[in-house]
């Protein structure tokens, strides 16, 4: 079975080998790119978590990602009993270019999972991974379509405060100013659309 993780920051997630279950409209599979725990960006994210917890009242039903990550794709289609690792291995095999991860500005989105996020430049390496992921995805549902990879930092239904001031913007922007590091993980996540809970199905490691 996949490993359950709560919507709490910095949960220690371990690989759990498994296979796809019967598909359901209640959940979808996503692909994340996650830095190593020892990376500068992970350490910077911990500082951000402290800030975010103190500003929880500024957001409606705020949740935090379990770790800093770049969301590449949603709606990955798996066949019954297909191994999670085989999906990740296929996606990783299509990358021919360096990832060369570059962050842009802090932005406010129009959905729960993209309420506050950091823009990510679609470099050739990231585009290769994303295109490979969408080879396996159902793009008929607009929810699944992600045109540009991004790093979500706050999940929420809405923002209840003015976030045009410099303090929150500088605090959130500091995450994108950190180094991603040389190693990272490609993860397959099973997401429950109703309660926003998820499972780490499997992960593979590769160099940037």
Swiss-Prot record:
Which GO molecular function entries does the Swiss-Prot or TrEMBL record give? 2',3'-cyclic-nucleotide 3'-phosphodiesterase activity
SUPFAM superfamilies according to UniProt: LigT-like (SSF55144)
Any GO BP annotation: cyclic nucleotide metabolic process
A Gene Ontology CC term for this entry? cytosol
Identify this protein by name. Uncharacterized protein UNK4,15
Upper taxonomic lineage:
Eukaryota, Fungi, Dikarya, Ascomycota, Taphrinomycotina
